[in-house]
């Protein structure tokens, strides 16, 4: 059986690279609810948690957990966009060093959000649809706050959790699960990690002049978050433009004159392709146009958007 308790610690470090932890086997059955301990080790006594997701046992309706840490809130569809939610869903954590327990139902696409000093603002659009906090929309009410989140899915057979540092890094989040299978932990980076990342970005910018420093967001002279290149490009489309062009020239030249073999480690086995007419073609499998630097940073545009090809 899956553990009924999972510890999530918002530490005083900075975020880690994405780490996925399988907290139970797919074959095991879970209870209808899960208790989660939120352990505050940020050093701040004013930390809030918000929990969102799609309620699997309630028609996949949008779910927020109310401030008492137990009561579900299902926002109704409002008549206009940007409507404030109708319930207090900011869960106050205790002082640094203390633990707050909450209980959730089965949720898909779940997120546990943490913010320091002030609660986050979640708005509701017709549908209903939740409007999440944004790190790229400068008019977003949360843009000047220190916040972060981890992701999870808890269904009738499994709990999956993910530190999810894909879009930005700010507050570090560590995950620990205890159960029949033992204890599993995804620790995040050590204390000072955000400052380390931001310092490295500033140094790289000084080295190559490519604008990596634009990924560092500060407030009052302190580092607030470090954005992914993709989110930096959202704010400045010229950022890192052409960064991989020299390397792409070499790759496209090399495989125009010789084949490329790829072990897919899947049903296709090892496939062989070659560049012809500027396109990397794997006969009978799929073809790929040359990516831009933005495509490479995002991995979900240009040739990486391959929903129409087998690969």
Where are these regions (language model features)?
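N-terminal export signals
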Residues: 6-26
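Extracellular low-complexity, O-glycosylation-prone Ser/Thr/Pro/Gly-rich "stalks"
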Residues: 31-311
């Amino acid at each position: 059986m899956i553990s009924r308790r999972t510890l999530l610690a918002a530490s005083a470090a900075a975020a880690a690279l994405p780490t996925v932890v399988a907290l139970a086997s797919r074959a095991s059955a879970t209870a209808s609810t899960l208790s989660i301990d939120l352990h505050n080790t940020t050093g701040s006594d004013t930390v809030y948690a918000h929990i969102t997701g799609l309620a699997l046992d309630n028609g996949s309706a949008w779910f927020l957990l109310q401030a008492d840490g137990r009561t579900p809130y299902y926002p109704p569809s409002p008549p206009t966009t940007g409507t404030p939610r109708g319930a207090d869903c900011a869960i106050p954590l205790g002082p640094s060093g203390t633990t707050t327990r909450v209980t959730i139902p089965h949720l898909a696409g779940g997120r546990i959000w943490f913010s320091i000093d002030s609660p986050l603002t979640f708005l509701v659009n017709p549908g209903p649809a939740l409007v999440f906090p944004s790190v790229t929309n400068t008019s977003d009410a949360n843009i000047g706050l220190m916040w972060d989140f981890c992701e999870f899915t808890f269904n009738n057979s499994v709990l999956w959790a993910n530190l999810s540092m894909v879009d930005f890094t700010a507050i570090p989040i560590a995950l620990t699960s205890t159960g029949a299978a033992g204890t599993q932990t995804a620790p995040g980076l050590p204390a000072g990690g955000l400052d380390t990342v931001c310092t490295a970005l500033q140094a790289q910018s000084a080295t190559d002049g490519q604008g990596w420093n634009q990924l560092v967001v500060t407030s009052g002279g302190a580092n607030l978050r470090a954005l992914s290149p993709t989110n930096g490009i959202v704010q400045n489309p010229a950022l890192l433009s052409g960064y991989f062009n020299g390397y792409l020239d070499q790759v496209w030249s090399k495989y125009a004159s010789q084949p490329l073999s790829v072990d897919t480690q899947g049903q296709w086995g090892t496939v062989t392709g070659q560049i012809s007419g500027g396109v990397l073609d794997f006969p009978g499998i799929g073809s790929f146009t040359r990516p831009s630097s933005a495509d490479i940073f995002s991995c979900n545009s240009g040739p990486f958007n391959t929903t129409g090809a087998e690969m």
